[in-house]
Amino acid sequence: MRNTMNLTNLLAPWLDCPELADITVQSLELDSRQVKQGDTFVAIVGHVVDGRQYIEKAIEQGANAVIAQSCQQYPPGLVRYQQNVVIVYLEKLDEKLSQLAGRLYQHPEMSLIGVTGTNGKTTITQLIAQWLELAGQKAAVMGTTGNGFLNALQPAANTTGNAVEIQKTLADLQQQGAKATALEVSSHGLVQGRVKALQFAAGVFTNLSRDHLDYHGTMEAYAKAKMTLFTEHQCQHAIINLDDEVGAQWFQELQQGVGVSLFPQDASVKALWASSVAYAESGITIEFDGCFGQGRLHAPLIGEFNATNLLLALATLLALGVDKQALLDSAASLRPVLGRMELFQVNSKAKVVVDYAHTPDALEKALQALRVHCTGHLWAIFGCGGDRDKGKRPMMAEIAERLADHVVLTDDNPRSEDPAMIVQDMLAGLTRGDSAVVEHDRFSALQYALDNAQADDIILLAGKGHEDYQVLKHQTVHYSDRESAQQLLGISS
């Protein structure tokens, strides 16, 4: 049963308003279109939309009260009425939202693990949840591929939901028996305070490379946003990738840091490192050493960065006290994440690997990872998103030309931009104009590659991963790389 609280108690940390005790808050809602009879509407000033413009609409929808961000006309602490509905104004409401929602949903008590970084967040959160389930502990995830238990994920609009959604979802998950939840924590989510009131048992840093500069402006601002997971949330354990330049620097600054590396470290360093890594078609075998002792594991994942992902997940769970032998014994039962280095293969045709790689660093790592598994030619099919960072377009084309034997440029959510102009930006990164084929339709691009590839080739279909849509100028249409691979290879879904 959902928790309720009277408005006086809900606002107690910021406002003394005993006259509002007879108003019951049962659900907070940020979107006026979603307000139902008896909901409390929260009107914040967002980065795009000012929720205060929709107060009247929320009241018409049945809001029983409104909590709004203050302004010069309506200062902090003001209580007024509109159509007999109370409106209370708070200063910097956007920064208080996480705590406000936490009070209503009683700050769900479970082990929270926050994972931040440019790449690897989804894989690591899902590996952590899988491993905990295999160890007998009910665990959930929140992130790009959805929220909830792995066998019943509910779609998510953003990597990190809004502050109210997060607290509401955690309360629901706790009610369903979750003992731990692994959350993808995006830089946007950190800057906008969406996880401000959460206390993390562990935080994980994967890596930092070019992404979201259209939002943050500089790499320095992007890095600073990520760092706040460890400096402002009292993480008991900070699991840091030492093989990343930024991670190595942060490790020196964080007292609670546990390092992770694919390379041997000095015994005095508080870290877990690989003493040997073997890659095969059946997966990755890692022997490790360090502050948690020695061990060996095998998991059916492919690619060097998945070796790092495995060790980051392992170090996190060991730091939280999960039995080491139970983790090593169950590693072979771990499964790849949908759309993350996901292999589709049949006899007599090239292998197709679907991956979410949509940044220069991710594309480079994906191609490098597949090269060690590839006995024939390596193909790269990818595009770049419209209305996003244009600077990465030539960079990604240069990487593909350098690391793949064949390059096919295609569309990936062109949005309001002309797809041909996006491709022109990518072509600028090539040293030879004829080193890439252009096919705007993704299905046709994969069909072209399969028609021209040999059986021992590997085709990387990058950019969409788990997504099942293509965002065009005036509409969003259904499209899935995974479904395309299955259809063209004749694999039943």
Swiss-Prot record:
Gene3D superfamilies: Mur ligase, C-terminal domain, Mur-like, catalytic domain, MurE/MurF, N-terminal domain. ATP binds at G117, T118, N119, G120, K121, T122, T123. It is found in: Cytoplasm. It catalyses: UDP-N-acetyl-alpha-D-muramoyl-L-alanyl-D-glutamate + meso-2,6-diaminopimelate + ATP = UDP-N-acetyl-alpha-D-muramoyl-L-alanyl-gamma-D-glutamyl-meso-2,6-diaminopimelate + ADP + phosphate + H(+). Pfam families: Mur_ligase (PF01225), Mur_ligase_C (PF02875), Mur_ligase_M (PF08245). GO terms for biological process: cell division; cell wall organization; peptidoglycan biosynthetic process; regulation of cell shape. Its cofactor is Mg(2+). A motif (Meso-diaminopimelate recognition motif) lies at residues 412-415. One of its GO terms (cellular component) is cytoplasm. Carboxylation is probably crucial for Mg(2+) binding and, consequently, for the gamma-phosphate positioning of ATP. The keyword Metal-binding does not apply. UDP-N-acetyl-alpha-D-muramoyl-L-alanyl-D-glutamate binds at L30, S32, N158, T159, T160, S186, Q192, R194. It is an enzyme of class 6 (ligase). Pathway: Cell wall biogenesis; peptidoglycan biosynthesis. The modification N6-carboxylysine is found at K226. Catalyzes the addition of meso-diaminopimelic acid to the nucleotide precursor UDP-N-acetylmuramoyl-L-alanyl-D-glutamate (UMAG) in the biosynthesis of bacterial cell-wall peptidoglycan. Belongs to the MurCDEF family. MurE subfamily. This is UDP-N-acetylmuramoyl-L-alanyl-D-glutamate--2,6-diaminopimelate ligase. It comes from Vibrio vulnificus (strain YJ016). The lineage of its organism: Bacteria, Pseudomonadati, Pseudomonadota, Gammaproteobacteria, Vibrionales. The gene is murE.
